[in-house]
Amino acid sequence: MAKHGKRYLEAAKKVDSTKFYSVDEAMKLAKETSYANFDATIEVAYNLNVDPKQADQQIRGALVLPNGTGKSKKVVVFAEGPQADQAKEAGADEVGSDDLVEKVQNGYLDFDVVIATPMMMAKVGRLGRILGPKGLMPNPKTGTVTMDVAKAVENQKAGQVEYRVDKQGLIHAPIGKASFDAEKLAQNFDALRDVILRARPASTKGQYVKSVAVSATFGPGIHLDPLNLD
């Protein structure tokens, strides 16, 4: 078991590990237990009763948080013609086609999000070994393969987050920064909660959400009642 430092242990004393906190309480406590010397990310972790091996239980999607994430993203777009112009006007950091493919092949990775038009995916596919392991391959489920590249860029710049269940049935997603008001964190939490609850597979039996916890970067987990997430 990993040893925790003094600052973590001091933060953990503020959390009662035997109780469930309300959303409002959890957001306030996540801020209070943030001890990093930077503006820590507040993250939520869902443990779901799903089997990701089943195609209909591979929960994945994206949403624009009402109050953003507090992080500015560098967005690159693979597009040509009118879509390339629209992406530039929407604020994309880099837009290109074969030239951008070559640039990435030569080591350019200074970006957080990749968006592509459907026609460009054959070219982007050549970058699979580079982008795939970093989770940067565009995907229609997250709105990053689209003809409406301008809207996709705007969503990313506005604070879109992606959520995806992993092999253990867990979803981790950021809902803001420790500098956010607790109320804004709660609004972001609610928005993510709603899409995850709506994504419940029809084939899932019994309790869908097994556990939910929020925490600041390096901070202790703060548990909420999985049966009462209001």
Curated annotation (Swiss-Prot):
The keyword Ribosomal protein applies. It comes from the Bacteria. GO terms for cellular component: large ribosomal subunit. CDD domains: Ribosomal_L1. InterPro entries: Ribosom_uL1_bac-type (IPR005878), Ribosomal_uL1 (IPR002143), Ribosomal_uL1-like (IPR023674), Ribosomal_uL1/biogenesis (IPR028364), Ribosomal_uL1_3-a/b-sand (IPR016095), Ribosomal_uL1_CS (IPR023673). Gene3D superfamilies: 3.30.190.20, 3.40.50.790. It comes from Lactobacillus johnsonii (strain CNCM I-12250 / La1 / NCC 533). This is Large ribosomal subunit protein uL1. SUPFAM superfamilies: Ribosomal protein L1. Keywords: Repressor, Ribonucleoprotein, Ribosomal protein, RNA-binding, rRNA-binding, Translation regulation, tRNA-binding. The keyword Cell membrane does not apply. Belongs to the universal ribosomal protein uL1 family. GO terms for biological process: regulation of translation; translation. Part of the 50S ribosomal subunit. One of its GO terms (molecular function) is rRNA binding. Binds directly to 23S rRNA. The L1 stalk is quite mobile in the ribosome, and is involved in E site tRNA release. Protein L1 is also a translational repressor protein, it controls the translation of the L11 operon by binding to its mRNA.
